Amino acid sequence: MNISRIAAFLIPFLLGSACSASAASVKASRAAEPKRPNIILFLVDDMGWQDTSLPFWREEDGTPKPTFLNKRYRTPNMEALGKQGMVFTNAYAQPICSPSRCSLMSGMNSARHRVTNWTLLRDQTTDAGHQALKAPADWSVNGIQPAGTRASGTTHLPLTEEKIQYRMEKPFPQVLGLPALLKKQGYTTIHCGKAHFGSKNTPGANPRLFGFDYNIAGTEIGGPADYRGSRKYGTGNFHVCGLDENNYYENDTFLTEALTQEALKRLDAIRKNPREADKPFYLYMSHYAIHAPSTCAVMTRGLRKSTPTPMTVTNGPTTKNAIPP
């Protein structure tokens, strides 16, 4: 047999065998790796430590001690989470929304990231004017910004991804966010709901620039103008965008329910996507509730009639927010 013909046959055969063996080796090594967990992080701001039926106060021996306010609420899902997992009774958040969110995203407290109040418009403070009390000159009115952000340049708006020019006159901290770190580890990252990391028309207003692959309804706003779908979730600066194409307006879907449905749709799409199905996911689930305004969901109206104690649903413990009879 012609030696050149043998070589011509053997070389592609050996190359193919080597590639198959290499692919099998990679597949085997991946199979041997410990399976990374999916992560769903729920964040609720403006919620007091007693605004749930799960008690956080403990006796000296560690026994849970329900308070009067704990007895006003029925939150069975939180009770289930408390029984199945760990309850931290000495962990504290910031007393206002933006600083807490910026801390969770960055791993820094407000003394380091310099965000000490809620944010909205670029370079504009939300502090009330006072003759004696002055805000620190270097606190970040623009919130946190993604790593690599410059004082001026071009950025993408959240949701529409339209490009705009921006310029920040005030100081701002740069952050390599948690989703960016998880993305580097092979996670598919999803943001759903309230973002409120950076001021309007800054890079920090766009969750995708912090490392999220997908962004559902997250912008610079901290609270919705309205929770009702029939009101199109409000208008003006506090309108919740990105939910107007799924019959939520027509069906008067409560905002909390709409966001939950959108998150489930995204998880289902990931499961069906061959490029993402085998990857772990990180879902940052941040409903706008219980932030103002106080609105009762249609599905919960009338519950007060069948409960022995006063009960509130969307915001705060005051009686004016209770479910109407």
Question: Where are the regions that the model predicts?
Answer:
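Active-site-proximal N-terminal segment of extracellular/periplasmic enzymes that hydrolyze or transfer
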Residues: V26-M86, A195
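A long, amphipathic alpha-helix that forms part
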Residues: D51, A258-R271, T309-P325
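Short, structured active-site-proximal loop/turn typified by the sulfatase FGly-forming signature C/S-X-P-X-R
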Residues: E59-R101, G107-R112, T188-I190, D213-T219
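Aromatic- and acidic-residue-enriched segments that line the glycan-binding/catalytic groove
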Residues: R58-T63, R101-S110, N201-A217, I221, ...
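Formylglycine-dependent
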Residues: L120-T188, A195-C296
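A short acidic, glycine-rich active-site loop
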Residues: T63-K71, K163-P171, N315-P325
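Bacterial N-terminal signal peptides that target proteins for export
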Residues: M1-F9
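Bacterial N-terminal signal peptides
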Residues: A8-A18
